[in-house]
Amino acid sequence: MTCINNYQKERTQMSNLTKEEIIAAKTDLGALRKVIAEGELIIKVRTPICFPCNMATRWTNERGLEDGVDYLEIDVTEIPGSDEYLKNVVAAKTAPVPAGEKEQVEHHEFVDAVIKGEKTTDVSGVKIQTPWIFNLAKLSFETKDNEDTQLYGYQPSNYESAMFKEHLANKQEANKVLAAA
């Protein structure tokens, strides 16, 4: 069994959310959109009858991570339309910047545009039935085919990268470090 003391690291916390905002985001799609657009969250997505979701819950519990403190857990069955919205958020964060637009678009600008319906995004590669722990602040536009979501919490082996600040912020930084060695 892994020693829990190994995970007493600096956590990425959701310090700006009130209790009311957390409750609203779990039950209302509009409130969830607002919270995602305004913050740099870690979101834990849960789907029904999902063994990997239970594994993710066990992983967070073993490390003392708390829903509403360290991440926001969303049950897609409790918010009408949230599954489609979350697909679009992840796809928007991992899609290449469309031709003719500024290359260094801020992630919140891109997500805001998706929320307002100003951009269309192909979400065919996003697996909504797969549970996620993903860190919106760490996702970038540098990779394609959802590599970022794989890297930052899409799989149980990567949860730690999503939840703790001390890990490298993106794969490109890791590659720079390796190239310089």
Describe the function of each predicted region.
Residues S124-L178:
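Non-catalytic, surface beta->alpha helical segment in thiol-disulfide oxidoreductase systems
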Residues M1-Q13:
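Short, Lys/Arg-enriched N-terminal segments with co-localized hydrophobic residues
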Residues P52, L72-I74, E160-F164:
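Extended low-polarity, hydrophobic cluster-rich segments
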Residues M14-E38, A162-A181:
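N-terminal leader/targeting and pre-domain segments
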Residues T27-D67:
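Local sequence-structure signature of Cys/Sec-based thiol-disulfide redox active-site neighborhoods
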Residues V90-L139:
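Structural micro-motif
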Residues K44-V45, G68-H107:
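Thiol-based oxidoreductase modules, predominantly thioredoxin-like and allied folds used
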